[in-house]
Amino acid sequence: MTTQRHYSPIDRLLLQADMAMRTLLPFSGQPYRPSPAIVQPDAQMSETETRHVAGLMRINHTGEVCAQALYQGQALTAKLPQVRAAMEHAAEEEIDHLAWCEQRIRQLGSHPSVLNPLFYGLSFGIGAAAGLISDKVSLGFVAATEHQVCKHLDEHLEQLPAEDEKSRAILEQMRIDEEHHAESALDAGGFRFPAPVRFGMSLLAKVMTKSTYRI
């Protein structure tokens, strides 16, 4: 017979602090799955192409930082235990993406964005606020966010040099996972956000992508 552990508010705050450090500190996120890039050949790219791919992967890495913070914030304030558990499980899956992107960025001779702590804090606050409103809104926010991420991944896949199979393999697997997260959130009862809200979210996403491409 299995028992479910019940965490106190202090326990949850400590867990959130631990997850924040694992998300933001270099090389601290250990993936549960090996990177899809491992089995792909190295690419011969020009310096300009390498810088561009590094910028794209930096954007994707920051996107995963935001997703991690969003899930953690929602898990902290979710009202139903099953919703909280779903958020925590999704956050664990995002650790893979976080680690894969960082590994690829380092391979390309670059670094994650210095703005990650800022975006983590903002996303955590948004996630916690959504959870306070209702679990339905919280799940809907997950779905809308993941659909936005899928659009960015599609755009980045089109921009990758044809020979960069390592980055392509990572983004393709991330695309599959993010779509699954979005559909799972809707299936669990998530609210489908109207077009104006999704448009506002896309504007905020553009701020993140423009700023993290270079820094």
Curated annotation (Swiss-Prot):
Under Gene Ontology molecular function, one entry of this record is: metal ion binding
Q: What is its EC number?
A: 1.14.99.60
Cofactor(s) listed in the protein's UniProt record: Fe cation
Lineage top rank: taxon: Bacteria
Judged by the first EC level, this protein's enzyme class is oxidoreductase
- Residues bound to Fe cation 2: 94, 146, 178, 181
Can you state which reaction this protein catalyses? a 5-methoxy-2-methyl-3-(all-trans-polyprenyl)benzene-1,4-diol + AH2 + O2 = a 3-demethylubiquinol + A + H2O
A single Gene Ontology CC term: plasma membrane
Record-annotated residues binding Fe cation 1? Answer: 64, 94, 97, 178
Q: Which family does it belong to?
A: Belongs to the COQ7 family.
Q: How does it sit in the membrane?
A: Peripheral membrane protein
The gene from which this protein is expressed is: coq7
Q: How is the cofactor bound?
A: Binds 2 iron ions per subunit.
Which terms are listed as keywords in the entry? Cell membrane, Iron, Membrane, Metal-binding, Monooxygenase, Oxidoreductase, Ubiquinone biosynthesis
Where's it found, cell-wise? Cell membrane
Q: Name one GO biological process term.
A: ubiquinone biosynthetic process
Task: Please state the pathway this protein functions in, per its UniProt record.
Answer: Cofactor biosynthesis; ubiquinone biosynthesis
Descriptive protein name: 3-demethoxyubiquinol 3-hydroxylase
Which SUPFAM superfamilies does UniProt cross-reference here?
Ferritin-like
- Any Pfam family: COQ7
> What does this protein do, in the record's words?
Catalyzes the hydroxylation of 2-nonaprenyl-3-methyl-6-methoxy-1,4-benzoquinol during ubiquinone biosynthesis.
Q: Which CDD domains match?
A: DMQH
